[in-house]
Amino acid sequence: SKLMGQGLRFRSLYDGEERLDRARAKGFVPTSECPSPSLAHRWEYLHTLHFPEGTLKNWENLDDVELVIRPTQQWLINYLPLKSVDAEKRIAKTAVAGTYRLDRVVRKKWEETAWIENTLEGLDEPGEWALNSRKGLLYYWPKQERPSKNITAPGLRELIRIEGKNNEALTGDV
C-alpha cells in the first residue's frame, strides 16, 4: 500500500496490539572466521561481513535493509543497517559497527547465525511485512483474506523535552 509520502521509516508494525513480523530471509552463516577470540573486538572488522553466494544483493532500498547477526559470539544479536553490498566479491559493509567481528560463531556449529530483514524476497509468510521508504511503499501479507483496519506503525514526535528556566546563572561546563 502507498504510504503518506516517501522517506517515512519505521521498524515495527502492529495489528491492534499484536506486533507483526518483518520479512525475514533464510538464514546463513558468514564465510569468514575469527582467527582468535582475542581479535574479536578489532575495530577494522566490525563493519565487514563476508557472506555466501546468493544471500545478499545491492537492493535499491539498501538503507531500509537490516542484517541480524550473532557476531562471533553466541550470546548476543546485533541489528545492523547495511551500507553497501558487493555481490560479486560477497562482501557487505554495515553503517553501524557490530559488537564483535561479523564472522561465524566461534567454537560452535550453527546452521544459521545471520539473516536479512525487510526485503521483498523475505516476504514469504502471512503476517509479514516489508517497507521500501524510498518509494513510500509498505508490502504486507495479511494473516486473513483481507488486512485488518487496525494496522499501525508507531511514531514519536519528541524523545525528550526540557522546559523552564534556571533560577541561577550557569557558568563553566554544563
Q: What annotation goes with each model-predicted range?
A:
Residues 1-174:
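Extracellular polysaccharide-degrading/modifying enzymes targeting complex plant/algal/animal polysaccharides
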